[in-house]
Amino acid sequence: MVKLRLKRIGKKQAPFYRIVAADSRVNRNGQYIELVGTFNPLKDEVKIDKELTLKWLNNGAQPTDTVRSLLSKQGILKALHESKFSKNTQTENKKPVSKKTTKKSKDN
């Protein structure tokens, strides 16, 4: 399963994180599939590529609790919800076409 999670980089007492899409079986600072954004907790600075994040979330990637919090603060989860909701309402608004049965009249 692919997860969106934090990968710690930086020095001691100066944490800096990359927000990455990674296989859940790989360790925290191991290989990752794609870099999605960065997070600097000392300056409370978050930079996230919205398109990449939405791509991974639509493909089934699960964010960790911390990343979910960061995504909601950036408004990305709201955008994901609206995109899914708008797709559902468009399909629900279309009425299914029913076939009407016609009776054949006999000419006698």
From Swiss-Prot:
GO annotation, cellular component aspect: cytoplasm; small ribosomal subunit
Segments of skewed composition (Basic residues): 96-108
Name of one Pfam family that matches: Ribosomal_S16
PROSITE patterns: RIBOSOMAL_S16 (PS00732)
Gene name linked to the record: rpsP
Stretches the record annotates as Disordered: 82-108
Name of the featured protein: Small ribosomal subunit protein bS16
PANTHER family: 30S RIBOSOMAL PROTEIN S16 (PTHR12919), SMALL RIBOSOMAL SUBUNIT PROTEIN BS16M (PTHR12919:SF20)
